[in-house]
């Protein structure tokens, strides 16, 4: 019965909310934090880098918590006017971001370290494995439906495995 601020265009998040038996409350990137901070919703998806700028600590108060678990992965697109940029800009942008992957990961880890330890909640191993299986199933379902691009799926797996090399899906990449 918990209310979850959910980007209503994000099919994966909607499926997670359905799976856990919560109620989806449509939100945007501009409204998810205010809804959480004002108590309109019980749960909000947010990356660690949102904690400070979106003042998520206001909604957490003394009794709130943050699961030390990635329920969602976010990505972004650079939206431009193609005719206003030099030839090859798209490829050079992709190469720039690929070359600075480690810097981006460090930015995320710095944000996580900036969140007070008392807010972090560790899931029991069995529950974490259940969520990992649920999320993998949702990804597979959305990929089969053509919602997820298979190349993007490979990149997102790389991100998950970089963040947690012991993640169960990364074991398939290990050579013994």
Describe every region a protein language model picked out.
Residues 9-10, 28-30, 44-54, 74, ...:
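Beta->alpha turn/N-cap motifs
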Residues 102-176:
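An extracytoplasmic/periplasmic, membrane-proximal ligand-sensing/linker region
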Residues 1-38:
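Bilobed "Venus flytrap"/periplasmic-binding protein-like clamshell domains
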Residues 22, 37, 41, 98-106:
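Sec-exported extracytoplasmic/periplasmic mature domains
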Residues 15, 33-38, 44-63, 68:
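A ligand-binding cleft/hinge motif common to bilobed small-molecule-binding domains
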Residues 73-92:
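A bilobed periplasmic-binding-protein/Venus flytrap-type ligand-binding module shared by bacterial periplasmic
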């Amino acid at each position: 019965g918990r209310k979850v601020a959910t980007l209503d265009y994000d099919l994966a998040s909607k499926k997670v909310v359905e799976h856990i038996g919560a109620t989806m409350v449509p939100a945007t990137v501009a409204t998810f934090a205010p809804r959480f901070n004002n108590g309109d919703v019980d749960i909000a998806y947010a990356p660690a880098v949102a904690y400070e700028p979106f003042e998520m600590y206001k909604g957490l108060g003394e009794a709130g918590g943050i699961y030390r678990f990635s329920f969602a992965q976010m990505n972004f697109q650079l939206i431009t006017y193609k005719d206003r940029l030099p030839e090859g800009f798209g490829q050079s942008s992709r190469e720039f971001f690929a070359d600075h992957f480690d810097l981006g990961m460090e930015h995320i880890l710095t944000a996580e370290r900036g969140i007070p330890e008392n807010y972090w909640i560790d899931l029991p191993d069995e529950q974490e494995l259940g969520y990992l299986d649920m999320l993998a199933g949702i990804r597979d379902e959305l990929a089969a439906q053509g919602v997820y691009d298979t190349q993007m799926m490979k990149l997102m797996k790389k991100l998950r495995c970089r963040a947690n090399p012991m993640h169960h899906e990364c074991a398939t990449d290990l050579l013994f």
